[in-house]
Amino acid sequence: AWEHRDPAEVFAAARDQLGLPFFIKPCNAGSSYGIHCIEGEEGFAQALADAFYHDGKGKVILEKAIEGFEIGCAVMGNEEVIAGSVDEIEIAGSFFDYEGKYEMKDAAIYCPARIDEELFAAARDMAKRAYRAMNCSGMTRVDMFVTPSRTIIFNELNTIPGFTATSRYPSMMKEIGIPFPQLIDDLVDLALQRKAGGDGRAEQ
C-alpha cells in the first residue's frame, strides 16, 4: 500500500516491481470505485488521485495483473465455518467494474462456477482457510482468481458483500440449500451468539 507520494515515483516503482499492466485501487472502498487498470504512465496521475479520493484514509494498493478469471465463495460462521457454492465472473473488459457489477454491462455471473469438481472443492477450501486466517466472523465473500495453469490465487475479502436477494453472496448460499430468509435468520443468530459469547471469531 502507498500513501501520498509523487505520481512519477509511484509509477516507476510499480512498473519495476509489478510489470505492466497493474491495478491501482483504494485500500478502503467498495463497488470498484477508484479502481484502474494501468497500462502505461499516461493517465496514471489522474488514476492515482482518483484512488486516493475514494479511499478516505489516504492509502491505495497496487496489484500485479493476474491472467485468468475471477471466482468467489460465500463463507459464513463464527467458530464453525460454512462455505457456500462458488461462482464465476465472466467479463469483456479488464476487470469487474461498477457498471459490470450493478448494470451487468459486458459481464455475466455463473453460479455455480463453470469449473470442474477438483477446482470447485479447492476454491471452497481456500475460502474457508482465508476466512479463518483473517479471523473473520459472521459473513464474508472470498474473491479469488483461477489462472490458465489451474492455480487458484487469493485476491481479497469482501466483509460487506452485496446483499439483495439476487446478489452474489445470497445466490451462493441458496445454491447449497440456504434460502434468503433463512440466511438472514442465520446471520442474525451468529451476531447474537458472538455478542453473548465474547469474540466468537473463526479459529485459525
Regions found by a protein language model. Give the residues of each.
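Flexible, glycine/proline-enriched loop segments at strand-loop-helix junctions
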Residues: 1-4, 32-38
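Active-site glycine- and acidic-residue-rich loops that bind
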Residues: 2-7, 69-71
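A short helix/loop element that forms part of the nucleotide-sugar donor recognition site in Leloir-type
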Residues: 6-14
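ATP-grasp fold ATP-binding core
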Residues: 14-33, 56-67
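Short Gly/Pro-enriched turn/cap motifs at secondary-structure boundaries
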Residues: 26-27, 51, 64-65, 131-135
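Residue-level recognition of oxygen-bearing side chains
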Residues: 29, 43, 168
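Phosphate-binding site of ATP-dependent enzymes
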Residues: 36-125, 146, 151-153
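ATP-dependent carboxylate activation and anion-phosphoryl transfer catalytic cores
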Residues: 116-204
